């Protein structure tokens, strides 16, 4: 018996069984298998298949090429035998016309004409015709907005463009129509009704949009514009250079010597005469603008510098008509002389410098020997309603108040200062008007001040004290309500008297102040008013400023106190809280309460031991202990103590759990 034959038959039988049940073979497969080395066979089969694909592609390509009757050996040889026997069909040739044959024989073919008006470059066309295109676009947009008919505007402008290009009227369109008299009247009515009601700013904006005035300021549109004419630029540069700017040095601007303020005409004449003297005279007045030796020189005229400084020292709020109304029958020269007396300090006399003539302030400074003071009537000073505080007036040493903060001295000016030089703060005033006599005649502007009252401001923003003259509070009858705002506002009027005292705000209405306008702006330099507002921001409400019971109750709950029944009791609680608690708002005062509780618990070793061991504390016993240490805690709400215990990780329980 041949065992090899038997083994081969058994293996074939196993293969037959495996082919009958493929799912069983998958179930019997182990979890991990070692793949056989079949990479070489895969590579060989891939190469063979790629060669077969290339051969098939070549056959398809040759088969497609045989459809064309090319007179080439490659095409005929590669054609299949069935198609090689049949001759290819001849293509029909189109006969040339007699005109084309004549042009070909003579050699003069039809050429394309180039017109100079054709667009060679779209970029060049847009650059050259930018302004006309922009005007066309703006006018089309404006008229379409006024009429509301964009299609009609487009048809009209397109027809006009065709007529301008060809010189003959273009073809008429069926849907084309011009404006009727009724439509033109409608546009005219829109213009008459809209433009008178528009502010000048909107009218100017429309004008600039239509005529292209605003595009020069835009970087993109200005870059698209063609370059301007060189002759125009030369004329503009000459006109600009003809006017020499006024340049002043720091010493000339702040010098103490100056003469009468000359009129602009005389200043220009003197400046012109000095220019005619030649370069030698101008070189004497040259002052370098930089510290390095660059040779740059600036021509400065002393008379112009003095006149400029005089104009700088004039206050914006100086109004001569107000003083003329207060003193009828008194001329301007007499009023100026009477207002500038010897008792007035130097800084105050500086405020009266103007073009109206010689002022007494010039007597305090040495005049130039060449100056001849002559009273002249200069231009009228413009009336400006811009008010400034005394600290912002020119000529006063009040630019930096040392009572408020310190400051570091700069070293960029040529002065050799060290970088660490610091001017310390002080409690004494640094103003130069200590001997200033305060007049008692206050104008009507300082008698009444209107305050805007806001009902939605927080309690911490209440002004508690006001130090000034005697104040009388008056609440206006009407409400100032804006349609866009939800909060309500009211006007409160204050009348001041000349008696200096601490004001009691008990007569103030039941509102909270949001804005206090200090009447430091004065109508004349003589009517200086020292209106001081002492503001104390505290969450507690002072008893001098009564509020409603609802606001007091909300304030007490925000701090963590028990709200009382009556309003007077709640006011007492707020006063007591302001004495015990420190903080600017309710959150800070509430945190101060928590810190006080923690400090009291840390003083008791037995209570602190229970806290460290997480032993529950009876709430009533904890409250009794805290009240025994500080009686003020009796007014604290129990929920506040529970919140503090929860924040500190202290376990609490009630007495009923025992």
Swiss-Prot record:
InterPro entries: Slx4_ascomycetes, Structure-sp_endonuc_su_Slx4. Pfam families: Slx4. The keyword DNA damage applies. Residues 75-90, 99-108 have a biased composition (Low complexity). It is found in: Nucleus. Residues 17-37, 74-123, 327-383 are annotated as: Disordered. One of its GO terms (cellular component) is Slx1-Slx4 complex. One of its GO terms (biological process) is DNA replication. GO terms for molecular function: 5'-flap endonuclease activity. Phosphorylated in response to DNA damage. Keywords: DNA damage, DNA recombination, DNA repair, Nucleus, Phosphoprotein. Residues 365-374 have a biased composition (Polar residues). Belongs to the SLX4 family. Regulatory subunit of the SLX1-SLX4 structure-specific endonuclease that resolves DNA secondary structures generated during DNA repair and recombination. Has endonuclease activity towards branched DNA substrates, introducing single-strand cuts in duplex DNA close to junctions with ss-DNA. Forms a heterodimer with SLX1. This is Structure-specific endonuclease subunit SLX4. It comes from Lachancea thermotolerans (strain ATCC 56472 / CBS 6340 / NRRL Y-8284).
């Amino acid at each position: 018996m041949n065992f090899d034959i038997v083994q081969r038959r058994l293996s074939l039988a196993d293969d037959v069984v495996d082919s009958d049940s493929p799912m069983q073979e998958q179930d019997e497969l182990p979890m991990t298998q070692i793949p056989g080395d079949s990479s070489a066979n895969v590579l060989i089969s891939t190469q063979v298949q790629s060669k077969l694909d290339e051969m098939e592609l070549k056959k398809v390509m040759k088969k497609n090429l045989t459809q064309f009757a090319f007179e080439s050996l490659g095409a005929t040889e590669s054609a299949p035998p069935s198609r090689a026997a049949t001759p290819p069909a001849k293509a029909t040739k189109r006969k040339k016309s007699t005109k084309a044959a004549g042009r070909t024989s003579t050699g003069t073919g039809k050429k394309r004409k180039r017109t100079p008006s054709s667009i060679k470059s779209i970029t060049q066309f847009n650059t050259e015709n930018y302004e006309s295109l922009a005007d066309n676009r703006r006018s089309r947009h404006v008229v379409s907005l006024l009429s509301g008919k964009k299609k009609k505007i487009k048809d009209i402008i397109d027809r006009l463009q065709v007529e301008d290009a060809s010189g003959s009227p273009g073809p008429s369109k069926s849907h084309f129509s011009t404006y009727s008299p009724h439509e033109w009247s409608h546009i005219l009515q829109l213009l008459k009704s809209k433009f008178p009601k528009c502010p000048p700013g909107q009218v100017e904006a429309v004008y600039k949009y239509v005529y292209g005035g605003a595009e020069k300021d835009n970087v993109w549109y200005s870059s698209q514009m063609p370059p301007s004419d060189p002759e125009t630029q030369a004329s503009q540069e000459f006109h600009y250079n003809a006017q020499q700017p006024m340049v002043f040095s720091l010493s000339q601007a702040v010098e103490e010597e100056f003469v009468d303020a000359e009129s602009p005409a005389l200043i220009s004449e003197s400046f012109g005469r000095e220019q005619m003297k030649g370069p030698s005279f101008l070189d004497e007045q040259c002052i370098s603008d930089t510290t390095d030796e660059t040779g740059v020189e600036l021509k400065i005229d002393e008379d112009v510098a003095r006149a400029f400084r005089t104009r700088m020292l004039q206050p914006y709020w100086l109004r001569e008509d107000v003083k003329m109304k207060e003193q009828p029958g008194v001329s301007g020269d007499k009023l100026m002389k009477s207002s500038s007396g010897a008792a007035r300090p130097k800084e105050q006399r500086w405020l009266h410098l103007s073009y109206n003539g010689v002022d007494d302030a010039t007597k305090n400074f040495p005049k130039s020997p060449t100056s001849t003071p002559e009273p002249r009537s200069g231009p009228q000073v413009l009336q400006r309603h811009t008010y400034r505080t005394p600290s912002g007036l020119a000529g006063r040493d009040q630019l930096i108040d040392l009572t408020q903060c310190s400051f570091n001295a700069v070293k960029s000016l040529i002065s050799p200062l060290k970088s660490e030089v610091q001017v310390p703060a002080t409690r004494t005033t640094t103003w130069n008007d200590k001997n200033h006599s305060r007049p008692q005649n206050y104008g009507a502007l300082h008698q009444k001040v209107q305050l805007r009252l806001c009902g939605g401001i927080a309690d911490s923003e209440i002004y508690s004290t006001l130090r000034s003259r005697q104040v009388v509070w008056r609440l206006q009858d009407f409400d100032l309500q804006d349609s866009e705002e939800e909060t309500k506002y009211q006007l409160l009027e204050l009348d001041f008297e000349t008696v200096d005292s601490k004001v009691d705000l008990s007569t103030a209405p039941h509102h909270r102040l949001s804005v206090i306008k200090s009447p430091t702006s004065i109508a004349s330099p003589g009517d200086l008013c020292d209106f001081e507002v002492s503001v104390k921001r505290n969450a507690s409400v002072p008893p001098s400023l009564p509020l409603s019971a609802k606001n007091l109750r909300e304030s007490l709950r925000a701090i963590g106190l028990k709200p009382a029944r009556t309003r007077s009791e709640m006011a007492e609680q707020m006063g007591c809280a302001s004495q015990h608690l420190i903080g600017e708002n309710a959150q800070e005062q509430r945190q101060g309460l928590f810190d006080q509780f923690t400090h009291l618990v840390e003083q008791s070793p037995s209570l602190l031991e229970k806290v460290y061991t997480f032993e529950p504390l009876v709430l009533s016993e904890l409250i009794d202990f805290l009240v025994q240490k500080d009686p003020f805690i009796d007014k604290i709400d129990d929920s506040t103590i529970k919140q503090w215990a929860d924040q500190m990780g202290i376990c609490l329980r009630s007495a009923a759990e025992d």
